Amino acid sequence: MRIEKSGFHAYNTYLEEPPRDAGNETALHRHVIIIGGDKYSFFAHWSGKFAHKGERISFTWDWDRTGEFRNIDKSSFEAFAKDGAVQIRGDRTDKRRPAGRR
């Protein structure tokens, strides 16, 4: 099933698995998005949000085996800025994070 250019009510992230000795990049986060009272979710190794307030989002989703959870296909997730440009964020982006200044 597909959600097309929809607004969202809430977007929250929760730490699902803590980081290992290798660092925070191995930590697994659950991303939960609420649209029209329905919860959609996916897992990512990035804790930052894939969409920001005021943006429209599109994604493909399917029920889990129990029929209880709506799982987002992370690779299909798109956020649209106000000008309509597609924003690719998270661990799918090809841009490097800015380096800290020392």
Per-range role (PLM):
Residues 27-58:
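Beta-strand/loop nucleic-acid-binding surfaces
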Residues 60-101:
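OB-fold/S1-family single-stranded nucleic acid-binding modules
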